[in-house]
Regions:
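Catalytic NTP-binding/metal-coordinating core of nucleotidyl cyclase/transferase enzymes
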Residues: 1-73, 79-80
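Catalytic beta-strand-to-alpha-helix segment of the class III nucleotidyl cyclase homology domain
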Residues: 39, 61-147
């Protein structure tokens, strides 16, 4: 059996709020909005050296080398989505939740696994709409950088 590849990473989990409800009532407009949001989110993740590992419809799992980079990406993309929603008048105004956690992960092919991924997803599900919820370990790591975020 081959050795499992592990490394420390910051995991960002995000999900679109009430996506199923939107898609049920306005399928094509919701898909258009989702595509517009992804055109905002994906480049921001890349800008802060993140890599998208998994997407499932309206959710994204990305990993970053740095908790500061992950947090900056989350802050910037939430602000950009809010700005988009201020000017959007045809399609649904989609909102997102974000959870960020730092932990050891398992890398297998093009995917990541581990308890850290699950914790980031749980934080995302508990995050207020349009906000970011970070774990205590992330808070400890970015504490001195908070002034600049």
């Amino acid at each position: 059996m081959s050795e499992v590849k592990r490394r420390l990473a910051t995991i960002l989990a995000t999900d679109c709020v009430d996506f199923s409800k939107h898609i049920e009532s306005q399928e094509e407009k919701t898909l258009s909005s989702l595509k517009e949001c992804r055109e905002i989110i994906d480049p921001i993740i890349n800008k802060f050296s993140g890599r998208i590992f998994h997407t499932a419809g309206d959710s994204i799992i990305a990993e970053f080398d740095s908790p500061v980079g992950a947090t900056k990406a989350g802050v910037e993309f939430q602000k950009s989505i809010k700005d988009r929603n201020l000017t959007e008048d045809k399609n649904p105004k989609l909102s997102w939740r974000v959870g960020i956690h730092l932990d050891d992960i398992i890398i297998e092919g093009d995917n990541i696994y581990g308890n850290g991924v699950n914790i980031a997803a749980r934080l995302e599900s508990q995050s207020p709409v349009g906000e970011i919820l970070i774990s205590d370990v992330v808070r400890q790591q970015i504490y001195l950088s908070l002034i600049h975020i």
